[in-house]
């Protein structure tokens, strides 16, 4: 995972990225309790998915949704993750490769990008996310749109 401190490298930028780092590490480890633990109890997720806009409220519901998306896999790999700041908001991006029977045969890649706000306790309270959906990897004989 890479992080890009804001404020031109000032030491104060790193603690602001800590909530993003905890969230991304939980995701990398497929530890959805840690993902949920990075969120405030009243957190809200708004996600633009291939099937449309969806919303979830509460750390438990949001953590459960990430478990639904990225749990129950035969193989799982965090390819890339970054965290930074844009206009005072946290910016998180991750790309995953996974194989899961529920998706069909072969490897799939998915990338998500989120902008988030943290509360004074360092937990994420709001995430606005966009997702590519599960994309079959090139060379697996499938048609790609």
Can you say where each PLM-predicted feature lies in the sequence?
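Short, low-complexity N-terminal intrinsically disordered segments enriched in polar/charged residues
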Residues: 1-41, 144-145
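A beta-strand edge to alpha-helix "cap/lid" segment located at domain peripheries
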Residues: 2-11, 67-145
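Soluble or luminal CAZymes and related metallo-dependent hydrolases
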Residues: 15, 19, 61, 108
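Hydrophobic alpha-helical core bundles mediating ligand binding, dimerization, or RNAP-core interactions
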Residues: 20, 27, 39, 62, ...
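Hydrophobic pocket/interface hotspot
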Residues: 23, 35-36, 43, 58, ...
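Short hydrophobic/aromatic segments of transmembrane alpha-helices and their interfaces
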Residues: 27, 44-45, 107-108
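A solvent-exposed, acidic/Ser-Thr-rich amphipathic alpha-helical stretch
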Residues: 34, 38-87
């Amino acid at each position: 995972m890479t992080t890009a401190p804001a404020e031109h490298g000032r030491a104060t930028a790193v603690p602001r990225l800590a909530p993003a780092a905890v969230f991304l590490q939980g995701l990398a480890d497929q530890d959805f309790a840690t993902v949920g633990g990075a969120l405030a109890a009243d957190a809200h997720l708004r996600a633009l998915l291939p099937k449309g806009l969806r919303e979830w409220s509460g750390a438990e519901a949001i953590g459960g949704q990430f478990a639904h998306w990225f749990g129950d896999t035969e193989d799982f790999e965090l390819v890339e993750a970054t965290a930074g700041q844009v206009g005072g908001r946290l910016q998180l991006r991750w790309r995953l490769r996974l194989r899961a029977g529920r998706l069909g045969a072969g490897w799939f890649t998915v990338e998500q990008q989120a902008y988030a706000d943290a509360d004074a306790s360092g937990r994420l309270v709001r995430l606005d996310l966009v997702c590519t959906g599960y994309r079959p990897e090139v060379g697996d004989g499938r048609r790609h749109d």
